[in-house]
Amino acid sequence: MQFLKVLRYPQLALLWSSQVLSSIGDFFYAIAVMWFAIRIAGSTGVMVSAVEAGAALVFGLLGGVYADRWNRRTIMLTVDILRACVVGSLPVLAFFGQLQLWHMLVVALLVGSLGSLFDPALQASLPTLAQDTRTLQAANGLMDVTRRLARALGPSLAGPLLVVLPLQHFFTLDAVSFLISAGAIFLIGRHLSPSEYTSKRRHDGVVGILTDLKDGFQQIRRHPYLPGIFVAVFVIAVTWTIAFTAGIPLYAERYLNSGPGAYGLIVGAYGVGNVISNFVMGSIKLRRPLAAIMLGRVIVGLGFLLMVCAPSLPIALLGSACAALGGPLDDIPLMLIIQTEIPPHHIGKVYSTYSTISMSAMALGGLIAASLYQYVSVPIGIVLCALLIMSTGIGGALHIQWKRKSGKETAVHPTKDTVIIKQECRSSQQ
């Protein structure tokens, strides 16, 4: 399987394994920070997660700008070391009995903002680490499955660890995982793109940042399909949040007459479907990425329809697993398009735009769901969302066919800089 063959490349295997550990560490951090925050400040403690999400949203576009300006290896190393120090301060404060809510709010702010710099730098570095498009596709599948593995492994590890470790040392584990990630990035340094591969333009101040953001938006606008894809990403993120994040817990309680256990099973089934689809998408040769994206959306919608077609837990589990198959069909080809059809010195900005759109839409979806389910039943709400998701896939496919038949499709050609950079990256790996 091509998906597993990627692990034969030491640089990719080392990076992926370190990111799995880092993601598991993040899961432990999330458990500990919410527990301490609520224990110290009651319901006000939920502000911690809101602050972290808000920081990632506010600094998302800015992170993409600097991921394209600076040496990406240096960015990731620095961010991991800073996150290790910041998170590592919490167990020290807890040990001396000095941990307060404002400490955790500051840490959440820093972790969220630093993550918005690390993620685009990582995504923009993958084309350099992969030797060809097929390997890059498989590497994207590996990275996409990372957080899903963390969700699966995290809960199973948390219980036994709490028997032997005080909860505050979950912060310690996360800090150590950041150091492991930094060590891996240091070791694969020669495979990562040096600073001359990043943006050659240098701007100062707010005007420079706005200019770089404008350049990133222009790259999206010039692409024949990315503008429509990004609009659909917003719609899908809103509707997915309404249907799954908000709708499924209500559906399990009101229509399946079940508690948190049933909800956990449905979420688990979704995780299993995601992982299976990731393995498949990382193993096959993707000839038509746009078709895969549109098919993925239809599959997600059909899965949601299946989930609520009858008030039955087995059917809900089957529908959840089926819907999950569509996620990687959408995500992995989109990452491949960004990484191979956008000039290397703009990948960070385009990726951060995608990430910011997704996070904004999910926040909006949560707000809409709070009102929507007061006026319509949960199954009807999920059905409406499913139909909207499917319409983005069907409508997108029809739009692509129309552009191709009418001759309005603009071919995407690598820029001169893109070709030179890819050739240099391959030669540096030999």
Protein language model features and the residues they cover:
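C-terminal transmembrane bundle of multi-pass solute transporters/carriers
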Residues: 51, 58, 69, 73-75, ...
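Hydrophobic alpha-helical transmembrane segments
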Residues: 101-112, 138-196, 261, 268, ...
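Residue-level signature of transmembrane alpha-helical entry/exit and packing/kink sites
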Residues: 11, 100-105, 225, 229, ...
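Substrate-agnostic recognition of the 12-TM MFS/MFS-like secondary transporter fold
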Residues: 13-30, 51-67, 71-86, 103-163, ...
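Transmembrane helix-loop junctions in multipass membrane proteins, especially transporters and channels
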Residues: 95-99, 124, 131, 163, ...
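Structural signal for membrane-spanning alpha-helices in multi-pass inner-membrane proteins
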Residues: 34, 87-94, 158, 162-163, ...
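Juxtamembrane intracellular "pre-TM" segments in multi-pass secondary transporters
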Residues: 1-13, 191-231, 416-418, 424
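Helix-loop boundary and gating motifs at the non-cytosolic
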Residues: 2-57, 218-270
